[in-house]
Amino acid sequence: MAKKDYYEVLGLQKGASENDIKRAYKRLASKHHPDKNQGSKDAEEKFKEINEAYEVLGDAEKRAAYDQYGHAAFEQGGGAGGFGGGFGGGGFGGFEDIFSEMFGGGFGGGGRRNHVVRGDDLRYDIEISLEEAVKGCKKDIRISTLAECDTCHGSGAEKGSKVETCSHCHGSGRIRRQQGFFVTEAVCPSCHGSGKKIEKPCKSCHGDGRVQKAKNLSVTIPAGVDTGNQLRLSGEGAAGENGAPAGDLYVVIHVREHDIFERDGSNLYCEVPISFTMAALGGEIEVPTLDGKLKLKIPAETQTGKLFRVRGKGVASPRGGYAGDLICKVVVETPVALNDEQKDLLRKLEESLAGKSKHRPQQESFLDSVKNFFSNLGKH
């Protein structure tokens, strides 16, 4: 089945900005996260599709390659972003690995003599709250991975069984072939790349030297992370073949949407409702922050949409430095469920303001614009 356009997956146009891409990813990843849709295969596939799209569009270089070549730019790379098919997938190999596999490490031949295959890199998606993202936290996770077999200690052979060098590839694990001017390499079909022949394979791991195991890990998430950030846990991926080094584990962060705050980079945004009397006369109101409440002075004659900046109450960068700001947007509330007395008072206020444009600057500005529009329309 043909892959969907990555922009279409995120619901974006091709010219979308970096912030548009990040916002779309956060919204969709939160909506389709497996924790919120347990047991839903459709949600799981959609979540993988969203992550794959963001791995490419969220990276400037990969996005440029995708814009020019489409999916063909990554067809040989083992999956977007280097993940070989998701959580349990293959490594982060690039073009160097591709050419090494094709030409044995270079155009002159000289292929690998010892078959050492590093373990696969793994991916784990974790969802945290905004508070945890801003302040940092520790999370215990459980992953399933290939680990060294306890029975044979990675040899792949039963105790006392002979392990001989493969006679087909002479222990290299690879077969070299001459094709014109080029020397190519392929995995040995006899030993399947191990470089050895086992007389009696280990019954626990069937000769692989590795078995699937569950592993518990404690992950320290630094303060200031955001959705899409990745934490690399070196050596916590799958065990390598034949004693080769293990791969790495990449923990991908997803920050849940907050009931009050919306994050944009290092700044936090929130809406603050105020009464129309406070908007007219001014006053003081309590506003929330992630560190507790603080008082904000509202000047007289404040209009809906006015922004107030509270410095240093945003998010600090994981790399250090100053915290961003909290931006409060004022929303003037219209009173509801009024009794007759209250309605009479408002009518008297309305009558006292009638015909006095200085009391209604926005309305008068709007009416002037309408008059000018129709006046200019009549001249054409």
Swiss-Prot record:
Keyword Oxidoreductase annotated: no
InterPro entries listed in its UniProt record: DnaJ (IPR012724), DnaJ_C (IPR002939), DnaJ_domain (IPR001623), DnaJ_domain_CS (IPR018253), HSP40/DnaJ_pept-bd (IPR008971), HSP_DnaJ_Cys-rich_dom (IPR001305), HSP_DnaJ_Cys-rich_dom_sf (IPR036410), J_dom_sf (IPR036869)
Binding site for Zn(2+) 1: 149, 152, 202, 205
Cofactor binding, note field: Binds 2 Zn(2+) ions per monomer.
Cofactor section: Zn(2+)
Domain J as annotated: residue spans: 5-70
Zinc finger annotations (CR-type) as residue ranges: 136-214
GO molecular function: ATP binding; heat shock protein binding; unfolded protein binding; zinc ion binding
Protein location: Cytoplasm
Pfam families per record: DnaJ, DnaJ_C, DnaJ_CXXCXGXG
Keywords of the record: Chaperone, Cytoplasm, DNA replication, Metal-binding, Repeat, Stress response, Zinc, Zinc-finger
Binding site for Zn(2+) 2: 166, 169, 188, 191
GO BP terms, alphabetized: chaperone cofactor-dependent protein refolding; DNA replication; protein refolding; response to heat
A GO-annotated cellular component: cytoplasm
CXXCXGXG motif repeats: from-to residues: 149-156, 166-173, 188-195, 202-209
Domain of life: Bacteria
Purpose: Participates actively in the response to hyperosmotic and heat shock by preventing the aggregation of stress-denatured proteins and by disaggregating proteins, also in an autonomous, DnaK-independent fashion. Unfolded proteins bind initially to DnaJ; upon interaction with the DnaJ-bound protein, DnaK hydrolyzes its bound ATP, resulting in the formation of a stable complex. GrpE releases ADP from DnaK; ATP binding to DnaK triggers the release of the substrate protein, thus completing the reaction cycle.
Free-text note regarding domains: The J domain is necessary and sufficient to stimulate DnaK ATPase activity. Zinc center 1 plays an important role in the autonomous, DnaK-independent chaperone activity of DnaJ. Zinc center 2 is essential for interaction with DnaK and for DnaJ activity.
PANTHER family: CHAPERONE PROTEIN DNAJ (PTHR43096:SF48), DNAJ HOMOLOG 1, MITOCHONDRIAL-RELATED (PTHR43096)
NCBIfam families with a match to the protein in the record: DnaJ_bact, PRK10767.1
Entry's family note: Belongs to the DnaJ family.
Binding partners and assembly: Homodimer.
Name this protein carries in UniProt: Chaperone protein DnaJ
Annotated gene: dnaJ
